[in-house]
Amino acid sequence: AQPEWITSDPDMRFKYGSIGAERDAGIPYWIFYVLPRMFPDKLPGPGGYAAFGVVWEEGQELPVGFSKKVVGFPRVANNCASCHTTSYRTQADAAPTFVPTGPNHTLNLWAFFRFLVDCAKDPRFNADNLMAEINLVTDLSFIDRLLYRFVIIPITRKRLLEREQQFAWLYRDDFPPWGRGRDDAMNLTKYFMIRWPMDDSFGPTDMPSLWNLGKYRADQGMRMNFAGDSHDAWSVVPPTEVVEIL
């Protein structure tokens, strides 16, 4: 379970709550933590994960839209808020105001997905190098050090390399980058989630806001999900997570 400061507040739940992605797509927390330190050359700019244009609230250990949950060991995954939390400033030097369910117009999701795969493809992604970086920032127990070195790191690399096939369309020269604030939601669903064979379809769109959903009338054929397959907001949440949330 996640801490009460997340589960007891609807806004915090939206921004940092788990939707179950940690099980299959989660990245071990300490690997996630050190990747920008090890591979700054693979980031789109300086600033660690901030280079991807994520929304990051002051004092939080993770950006908005990144959940942390223990599934055997702490893992990090994305939730809906990655793409659907926006920010604005009333003046150039003012602190940002964050708006949950707004479109994240600064997120470079294309670059983030490629970053994870490119790190795993690099020969520097190995137990010796990762453990050296992890040991600089935390003191793992003896058992955890063994698990990371001999189990967690090798399996993480294997799983990330498997994503290269699922994300092969991100590397096609005839497909341009999506741009900030955009994603190719249907191809993500087809190739990454349900693993359909790849075709030549390409359709990045602006990330939409999620507010005022009451205007969509399912009885008139207006479906909530962009794919048009459902009017149920819970349809993207694994059943085990629905039980836990309820």
Residue map of PLM features:
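Extended surface/linker regions that mediate inter-domain or inter-protein docking
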Residues: 1-91, 100, 111, 115-246
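Short cysteine/histidine-rich metal-coordination sites, predominantly Zn2+-binding motifs
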Residues: 95-107
